[in-house]
Structures are given as C-alpha cells and as structure tokens.
Amino acid sequence: QKPGETKEVHPQLTTFRCTKRGGCKPATNFIVLDSLSHPIHRAEGLGPGGCGDWGNPPPKDVCPDVESCAKNCIMEGIPDYSQYGVTTNGTSLRLQHILPDGRVPSPRVYLLDKTKRRYEMLHLTGFEFTFDVDATKLPCGMNSALYLSEMHPTGAKSKYNPGGAYYGTGYCDAQCFVTPFINGLGNIEGKGSCCNEMDIWEANSRASHVAPHTCNKKGLYLCEGEECAFEGVCDKNGCGWNNYRVNVTDYYGRGEEFKVNTLKPFTVVTQFLANRRGKLEKIHRFYVQDGKVIESFYTNKEGVPYTNMIDDEFCEATGSRKYMELGATQGMGEALTRGMVLAMSIWWDQGGNMEWLDHGEAGPCAKGEGAPSNIVQVEPFPEVTYTNLRWGEIGSTYQELQ
C-alpha cells in the first residue's frame, strides 16, 4: 500500500510508566487506526473498486504480485479520527462503535511511541498493566477489547510498505485471519496472519474475560491451509478466565450487588507474575473501585483447582489443550518478554452474538440478547473509554485509599 496525499493526524494520548519508588511518570504516545480501516483505493486510471475485503486476498487485476499491488493500491491518511469513532482527551481514549450519523466504524487502534513511526513495545513478563474503564454503555453482545499482539515494532515497514506503523500496518493475532494485506504487503497467496495474543480485557458491562493465546511461532507468521485451522500453529480458544465459567456469579456486573459494579468506572489490574528465572508462571487479575482493592475471585467448580489466578494447572483442568501444546504460560511469557503491541477495539458479532463471552456458562445474557439488532434497542450508541493506561513494577500501578 502506497500512502496517498491525505494527511494522517494521530490523536495524542498520555500514558504512564510506574516504579515502586518513583510512582507513575507521564509519557507521550499516539494512537493509530488499523491500516485496513484507512481509506484504500486504486491508483488513478485503474477504475473504481477497492483493493480487497477482509477474509480474502486482494483482487488479481490490481494485485498480480506484491510489487504491482504496492503501486496500484493507495492508502489515504485519516485527518480526523473522530470520524472513525476515535477521540483522545489527555489520558483518555474513547472508542465509539456507532456514530451519531448511524455509521458503524467499530474501530481498532494501536499504541504508537512518541515518534509515531514505531509501535510502543510492551515487555510485561514480571510486570503489571493497569487501566481505568467506563463500561456502562456496553450491553450484552458488545466486546470492548484491550490486548497485546506480537506485531513487528515498525509495522514491518519495507520497500513495498513505506507507511508502516505510522499507518497502522502489521496486525496479527492468534485467530490467523486472512486479510488482503499482511505487514502492509498484498497477500497474494491468501495466507493467514498469525501471532501470539494476550487478551488482557475482553468485556462488556455483564461479563469479562482474560485469555492468553499461544502460538508456536515467534512474531507474525504467515500460515497456509491446516496451519491456520484449529489444530494449527496458534491456540484459537485461549485459556479463558471468566468468573461465570467457574460458578462465581456475584463478582462482576451492573449494580451494587456485584463486587465489581460496572455501572461506575473502575480500575483493571493485570499482573504477569514470573519466577526467579524470569519465566511467566501466573496471570493475576483484580480490580480497584471507589479506592478499594477488589481481590480476584476464587474458582468454585468441581474438577478445577481452587485458585485465583491463571496458571498451567488451571488451563490444563479447564480443557485448554491447544494452549498447553503450543507453549502454555511459559510460551506466552516468552512473547511478553520479546515485546508486544497494545491493541484496543470495540466490536459486535453478527454471526454468534458474542455468546462465548456472556451467555450460558460464560455469563448472564440470554440467547440472542447480544444480537446487533437487539443491542441498538438497549444502547443506541455503544462505546468504551479507557483512561490512565499505566504499566511497570508489580504493585506500582494502583493504590488503595486508606
């Protein structure tokens, strides 16, 4: 994709790096929308039509090979991110799923470093990551996601991908989806884009889920055929941590009767606990609300070890076979040590109504309640706001008011 004439204007976001001794110090970052959300069109004289749709390789007439594809497909900048449902205000990032004019941008964005030319690389093994969230406008079926992906620091900037991270190129995750461009290059052979993925937060106001997803490849891997499938190189299900799945139903939800009351903002703390050799052993999630630490729930299910953290024993017992086979918690830690990119998004699910997240064993939502046609009746303008993104030493990113 060749960058076009339209200017790209990245919203600025203040984030924090924390130590026990020095507290949290502000840092400057910028936000970039995924490259495939940018307007992509054919070069002048090549007629109307785009350069391919999600799930498919690019069209052969404009993209017979990588070189022609780079010349024939122009990616424009985005001068006004608010038109895509993305706005920042100091330390806050707001993502709107639906705009007042009815458009549904469903944005996915990444965190750039202060140069805007590279992604901010997070190395979280042995550290913790914390943010504040307002999830009040996220009914059943919505998914506000904040997660890490083992993308290339420059968005794999290259001769035929001159835009790179500046334009949001290089996305990959453990689902190994086929997209018309991978690492900014025409995906002529229709391969899948795979990499390690750490889902810190996938949630709405009714249910919430943490899940490491391992792959047995480093960085972005182009899969083909069986490699892209369920038994392939990445763990598609992840090792999920959701209170409802272990019979704890009073922990998280809308109202005072829940320990975490999603009708008010709250703080989400995720610790990546390592052993002395620096290997990831456990992932520990808890919350802070109204100045009080809300400890993690403990599992309450037969056949599942009594625990308040994700570890190999828990993953094994909950049937996360692919996770265990493809590297398990130590493998996830190796990716977190190498460095991962922060992605944040908001979306709904036309096909499955997000029922894996909040229905049946996973939550209180009724069958079909999360259908997009129902969501808009309940909440015409679903959105999420993430504030005060901060990371650093264990115990440094949150405090309890005495």
From Swiss-Prot:
Enzymatic reactions: Endohydrolysis of (1->4)-beta-D-glucosidic linkages in cellulose, lichenin and cereal beta-D-glucans
Q: Which residues are glycosylated?
A: 89, 247
According to its UniProt entry, the function of this protein is described as:
The biological conversion of cellulose to glucose generally requires three types of hydrolytic enzymes: (1) Endoglucanases which cut internal beta-1,4-glucosidic bonds; (2) Exocellobiohydrolases that cut the disaccharide cellobiose from the non-reducing end of the cellulose polymer chain; (3) Beta-1,4-glucosidases which hydrolyze the cellobiose and other short cello-oligosaccharides to glucose.
List-wise, which residues carry Pyrrolidone carboxylic acid?
A: 1
Q: Which family does it belong to?
A: Belongs to the glycosyl hydrolase 7 (cellulase C) family.
Q: Which GO terms describe its cellular component?
A: extracellular region
Instruction: Name the Gene3D superfamilies for this protein.
Output: Glycoside hydrolase, family 7, domain
Which key words are in the record? Answer: Carbohydrate metabolism, Cellulose degradation, Disulfide bond, Glycoprotein, Glycosidase, Hydrolase, Polysaccharide degradation, Pyrrolidone carboxylic acid, Secreted
Q: Does the keyword Disulfide bond apply?
A: yes
Gene Ontology MF term list: cellulase activity
Please classify the protein's predominant subcellular localization into one broad category: secreted
Listed name of the protein:
Endoglucanase 1
InterPro entries for this protein = ConA-like_dom_sf, Glyco_hydro_7, Glyco_hydro_7_sf
One GO BP annotation here?
A: cellulose catabolic process
Q: Which Pfam families match?
A: Glyco_hydro_7 (PF00840)
The entry's localization annotation reads: Secreted
Q: What is its EC number?
A: 3.2.1.4
> Secreted: present as a keyword of the record?
yes
Q: How does it assemble?
A: Monomer.
Q: Where is the active site?
A: 197 (nucleophile), 202 (proton donor)
Q: Which organism is it from?
A: Humicola insolens (Soft-rot fungus)
Q: List the disulfide bonds.
A: 18-24, 51-73, 63-69, 140-365, 172-195, 176-194, 215-234, 223-228, 239-315
